[in-house]
Design a protein with these regions (language model features):
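Amphipathic alpha-helical dimerization/coiled-coil segments
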Residues: 1-31, 53, 100-133
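Alpha-helical structural elements
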Residues: 4, 70, 91-92
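N-terminal helix-turn-helix DNA-binding core of bacterial DNA-binding proteins
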Residues: 22, 26-69, 94-103
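Hydrophobic alpha-helical membrane-insertion segments
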Residues: 49-50, 85, 110
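Beta-hairpin "wing" of winged helix-turn-helix
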Residues: 61, 81-91, 98
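Residues within the DNA-recognition helix of helix-turn-helix
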Residues: 76
Length: 133
């Protein structure tokens, strides 16, 4: 089969049917892809985990906790806020950030646990087996 051709007759019709029935609808796949893109940035991920632990922090305290500059934290918070994951509470000239709600927090805690497990089991790292050779 050359590039661009379609396969007209399935080799295994039952598995093709299972694959079709088990896939995400296009819009859900698009939304999930966008969310994973938001979560895919290390600083944004660290901001979220810091807010899980501390509940609420200002930009400066987040920058100190993460040991990164305030511009990086501010940008990360803007992206997270745009996607509805964090909210800002104004207190005079200060802004304090927290996760949007308890559902966001509990969903994020569970998602992080699952993602950490996936990363530990499926991504290269210290536990990587030597390549054959």
């Amino acid at each position: 089969m050359t590039e661009g051709e379609t396969h007209e007759h399935p080799v295994d019709p039952e598995r093709v049917a299972a694959a079709r029935s088990g896939q995400l609808p296009g819009e859900q796949a698009r939304q999930l892809g966008m969310l994973l893109g938001v979560l895919g940035d290390p600083i944004r991920m660290r901001i979220l985990t810091a807010l899980v632990a501390a509940e609420e922090l200002c930009v400066g305290d987040l920058a100190l906790a993460l040991e990164v500059n305030q511009d990086a934290v501010s940008y990360g918070l803007r992206v997270l806020r745009r996607h509805g994951l964090v909210q800002r509470r104004a207190a005079g000239r200060m802004g304090f950030y927290r996760l949007t709600n308890r559902q966001t927090r509990s969903g994020l805690v569970e998602a992080l646990r699952q993602l950490q497990e996936l990363a530990r089991n499926h991504l290269p790292g210290d536990h990587q087996e030597p390549e054959p050779g």
